[in-house]
Amino acid sequence: MTLNPFVKAGIGLSFALLWSCPTLAEMTAEKNFGLDVKITGQSEDDRDLGTRSGGDVNGLGLDLRPWVYGERGNWSAYAMGQAVAATDTIETDTLRQNDDGTSTDTGDDSRQPDKSYLAMREFWVGYSGLTAYPGEQLRFGRQRLRSDDGMWRDTNIEALNWTFDTTLLKADLGVAQRFSEYRTDLTELAPEDKDRTHIYGNVATQWTPGHWVGLRAHHTHDSGSLKNPGETVDALDKTRTGDLTWLGLEANSDAYNWRNDHTVNYWGSVTWLTGDRDKLSTQQVGDDQVATGKQSGDVNAWATDLGIRLRLDPQWQVGAAYARGSGGGGDDGSNNFEQTGLESNRSNFTGTRSRVHRFGEAFRGELGNLQAATLFASWQLRDDYDASLIYHKFWRVDGNQNIGSSGINAVVDDNGVNRQLVDGEKDLGQEMDVVVTKYFKQGLLPASMSQAIDEPSALVRLRAGVFKPGDAYGKETDSYMHRAFVDVIWRF
């Protein structure tokens, strides 16, 4: 198996970060290392809703993740690799699933995921001596960036990130840009990630015990270029550029902390999106897509996410949530909200340790021209078991605009025109999810690795969703689609 230059560089940099620093090179008993073993079974039928061939996945995957961590004084370093072997193209990683479950057809294999591959997930060095507070760290390298709700950031990316985390104040500030996937099978970045720089900052304060308010900001600068009129456009070319800024307000009762025992938990956020977007216009000429020009416009959009959760007793909780990302604005879609591009939309909103997709394990919507109403119930028995049952209902905000990315990849016939959705129809569908986990053993991992490793040392988990398409997908599509996973994880 040939390693691409970025993977080689990642491996080399990982060893350099861990061993070339004088304070780390002398570590012996203080270093930590281990191996995460994950076996994933996946069943999916079918993301195309019967509108084209393919779209099914049935198989088993083995995911090995060796890691090493060390610290001495104010310095720390961490690296995690990955080796995957599977019988099909299995999603063993919830952080980098394709939104629609598809691979990019480029005419080569630069964005074609293989059943088996090697990767570098993380490699970073950290320094905690800028202030006297124990929850402060400056970290440089490929690392996990994560917001509690998963709707702003939850990904592995190259970044310079400063975190400040104390009892009464939390803040982070950083800059990030993706340079490679660091995988042997994916040698090209996705077009939307090329030449895109992220600058972000958050601050939140605990204004009364157990209740937080905060401000969030995120800016993306896309320095990529679009094809000129008459040039052929392939699947790896950028189709949009622009500068976008997100500003948000949030308030919550520490609702994403599954250990909190409040009788009533809540979360609420509102986000404004402003900036400018350039979109490439194309037309089909023979077998090629040819650029015809670009459409430029200002962006003025907003989104909100609201939720409440009631604890009935120490084991049972019930709740409801509503989210809306604006849509519309005419031909240029100036009112269409979009997320930052670093989100996973996974969080502990049901009140259990298991992180659940906010917009359905099957549908996997993005908060753009989308509104979602959610009801859920959850159960937790000590640290041994948890379960969540979730119902979602999805609509378009504007029936004439497309939604953001999702886990559905259908092409519908709308009066002889192939579209993603039927023009004018808002009903996207509904979904039922179930997530059940059995935990076997608490892990003995360094506290500073809590962002990189979420779980205890052993578990078995079922994640399953059944989606029923609505009128927006037309009358010729399948009545149901499902996506289900069984994960077995053991950490040595």
Swiss-Prot record:
Q: What is its main location?
A: membrane
Tell me the segments the record calls region Disordered.
89-113, 323-349
Pathway(s) this gene product operates in, as recorded in its UniProt entry: Glycan biosynthesis; alginate biosynthesis
Q: Please provide the record's keywords in A-Z order.
A: Alginate biosynthesis, Cell outer membrane, Membrane, Signal
Q: Which residues form a coiled coil?
A: none
Give the protein family: Belongs to the AlgE family.
Its recorded name reads Alginate production protein AlgE
| Species in which this protein is naturally found | Pseudomonas putida (strain ATCC 47054 / DSM 6125 / CFBP 8728 / NCIMB 11950 / KT2440)
